[in-house]
Amino acid sequence: MVVTASRTPEKKIDANADVAVVTSKEIEEKHFDDVAQAVKNVPGVFINSHGASGQVGNSDQIYINGSPNVVVLVDGMRRNTNGNSLMNASIAELVAMDSIDHIEVLKGSASTLYGSDAQGGVINIITKKAKEDGVKTTLRTSFGDNSKEKYTLYNAGKEGNVFWSVEAGKELAGDYKDGWGRKVINHLNAEHYNVKLGYDLGNDSDITLNYEKYKADYTRPDYGSTSIVSDKGKKDNDSISLQYKARLSEKLTNQFSVYRNKTTFKDNYGKSAKDLWAMDMKTTGISDQLTYTANKQTLTGGFDWYKDEVPYNMGSEPEGDSVHNIAFYLQDKIDLTDQWNITPGVRVDHHSAFGTHTSPSLSIGFKQNENTNYYFNYKTFFVAPNMYQLYAPGIPFYGPVGNKDLKPQEGNTIEFGINHNFSDTLSGTFNIFHTHAKNLIQHVNGYGFENTGKANVNGFSLNLNKDFNQHWNASIGYSFIHMPATAPNKNINSDGILPESTLNINVGYQADKFNANLSGRGIMNRYGTKADWSGKPTKMSNYANYWVWDLAANYQFTKEATLFARVNNIFDQFYTDIGSSQDPYGTWYSAPGRNFEIGLQFQF
């Protein structure tokens, strides 16, 4: 397995980092609807979803190693948004799953190469590129309960030096029932288009133009799953990018990218102006990277520039506001001996609102042999408040939301890890970390933002992967995170939003024409919000522990045709992914109960 945690390809076992990979094979066999579904079972990753899908209402909030400050990339290009309240990137709206080659989840601060705001980690989505002449087409359709329908077309190929891919899809969904059998208002009518066109320049060089489009109409409950009042919304996102990769010499490569991402949504439209939430967000960016590889040294350097804008926000702040950031970075991996390596790095950011900041880093690796690698990392981070946290208008009866006096969140992460192959069929990883942050930016009384002081996060994760024989395989991952409560009226782990322990289990079976995967996710000690805005204790602690099991199966009955099925939440577990929910009969966002999906796939 080759990964790019250091922005250069290397074997996964050699990476001085805690990296998990979701492969295209796993995406195809488990039929994930979006990137959020694909990464939520990665140990150390927690996804806050307000219902059946982040496509309905707010997109899913991502946490890695306890931090919501995560950088999301597609082919190395930034996809974070700036201006919304509940998300850092719209990963539930990244639904072009056939176009994905693999997803790398880098856990732990990665500030030097990926951005000083990558406090928790990085999700890098690597898309497919046709490498051999020929054309491949995939057609897929599926139906399920809760009025779910899904249709997808994917075509990719290469002819001479020209390569391309085209993906189009439509998804429909209706009301669902939670684990208690209660109906939850839900409607989705979404479509997406993705076009990639490239030219192979030879000598490991190419130029690629990519365009993505996502549109959706949705209906959600007004406030919590028990609400009988429905609110309507619309989303309209698009992204365009141009990327040039070149091998300038045997030792020197270059990657240049320019991109523009746009997100538009209207939530609660059709109601009074005071209830409408309409917003446009736009990001424009340019990046360039040079990598020089010698016998015992890999030098990586470059610059990133991006500008975040909120062109429209219902005529209130942050409408018309923008921020920009330019950064220069340099990292040098030096092989001191055949076993020891050291990687110093530095990133210098200049933020238009918060000035210049330097983020140094240091990594030390010891490769005991071909099967064992130890590493120690020290990384710093610098997270500027987003425009919503700075400028959002106040809410009647609740007080101010935005706070123009916020300071950037700063700190460092120290981690130690081991990557080890016990045998050809058994591998494992272990990682332990400590993060210290100051000027922590948090909600106060559920609405306004303040710097609440310091925070110390301790955690570790353990993963094992085993191939028993040609048919059976299994994996197990455990992660532990502890963040002390920041006030007497708060719970641990960001007031109970995050679980202390998570256990992820996967069992796979593979035969000539049949395969199946059983996945389980155990959440332990996620106590939820301790008190509501009035100080009254919530009932979240009664639902602090639960298990959710999913099953996916595929049967290839001809060379071109495959029948597939999914059962989600097999045991009809009642739960919520939103730790800030308070009462199952009040402010509560239920996840779907047991639900089914069956479909056909044709490839030719």
How should these model regions be labeled?
Residues 155-159, 198-202, 376, 495-604:
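Conserved C-terminal beta-signal and adjacent last beta-strands/turns
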Residues 215-217, 264, 309, 316-317, ...:
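Surface-exposed extracellular loop regions of Gram-negative outer-membrane beta-barrel proteins
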Residues 35-38, 60-63, 73, 90-93, ...:
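N-terminal periplasmic accessory domains that precede
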Residues 36, 40-78:
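Extracytoplasmic beta-strand/coil segments of soluble accessory domains associated
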Residues 225-247, 279, 367, 373, ...:
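Outer-membrane beta-barrel signature, preferentially recognizing the C-terminal barrel domain
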Residues 335-342, 432-436, 451-533, 559-562, ...:
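Gram-negative outer-membrane beta-barrel transporters
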Residues 61, 78-107, 403:
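Short acidic/polar hinge/loop motifs at secondary-structure boundaries
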Residues 112, 124, 132-134, 140-142, ...:
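Periplasmic-side early beta-strands and strand-to-turn transitions of outer-membrane beta-barrels
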